[in-house]
Structure formats: C-alpha cells, structure tokens
Amino acid sequence: MRKDQFVLLSQNKMIGLFLGDTDFSEIVLSKIKKQKIKYFIIDFSKNNKFNKDKNSFRISIGRFGTIIDLIKQKKCKRVLFAGKISKPKFSSLRLDFKGIYYMPSIIKAAKIGDAAIIKSIIKILNNERIKVISSIFFNPELSLKKGCYTKLKPNKQDLISIKKGKFFFNKTKSLDHIHALV
C-alpha cells in the first residue's frame, strides 16, 4: 500500500466515484469496497448499472450544480473517474444554473475531442476545490512500468518501426486518442 493510500484510509475520508460502463469501473469499486473506504457513486452508465448499491446516485451530466452540491454534502475532497462515460447529446441535456454556467466551455472542448471534455470537467472540479485522482490510484497492478516484459528483445527492424511509431505519435495533438500504431 502506497503512502498516499494509507493517508486516505487513515483519515477515513469519503471518495466520490464517477462510474460509467465497462468492467474497469466494477474493478475499481470492488477494490474500494475491499479496502473499506467510504464512497458514493455518481452513475453515468447507460443502463443504470450501479442502482443496487445504496450509495449510488443517478445524475445527468448537465446538472453540475447538483453533482457539486452532492460532493460537498458528502464532505468529499477527492473524486475518481472510471469506466466509459458516453458523450451526451448537448441539445437534449437538462441543465441547472451551474450547468448553464459551465456548458459553453464543455461544448468548446467537445469540438476538440473526448479527452478535452474530460480535461474541462477536471478543471471545473479543481475550481470547486475538488481533487481528481488517477483512475489507477487503487489499482496500480493494472499499469506497467517502463521496460521490456518479454524474453525476446527487439531487433534492428523492430527498433526502426518503434521509432517511426513514436514520430507519428508525437505529430498528433495531445488531446487525440490513438488506440494503436502499426
């Protein structure tokens, strides 16, 4: 257990979970339950996946005021995003006052890409003094350190191919999502 996880556990703080679809959100939730950390869920899944949990709340993405009020009511200082949160149709969103205030920056970010939307939401939460934790904070075993994890070492042609991939990766925008480079 890392030091910052121990501090979070020892202070017995509440953590807010913005959970969407995919198995990753369930993995994060089970890990938090095992560590007996107080939590609440803001459910963004399509089919209300977490409605059986007593700490689950289904709130529309456009209701920033309600979300922020809930976070402050639970005395939560940290939130975590996990799972796939589908992009909403901005024309059909029901907005509250804070939603109306923050929506122009989110729509502007939506024109850039999905990662820009997440960054703008993180910026909004930072303005409200709410810290966003990395999604692998409780599951560090899901990420690997830098290095070669096979017995086979890359040959000269592989190294050239890797160099080309890095070149094309560096040419793309920082907010683009690239799933694979061949």
Where does each model-flagged region fall?
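N-terminal basic/disordered segments at the start of proteins
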Residues: L9-I42
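N-terminal beta-loop-helix "entrance" segment that forms/cooperates
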Residues: D43-G62
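Glycine-rich anion/phosphate-binding loops
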Residues: F57-I71, K111-A115
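Internal active-site segments that recognize and position negatively charged phosphoryl groups
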Residues: I121-S134, S143-V182
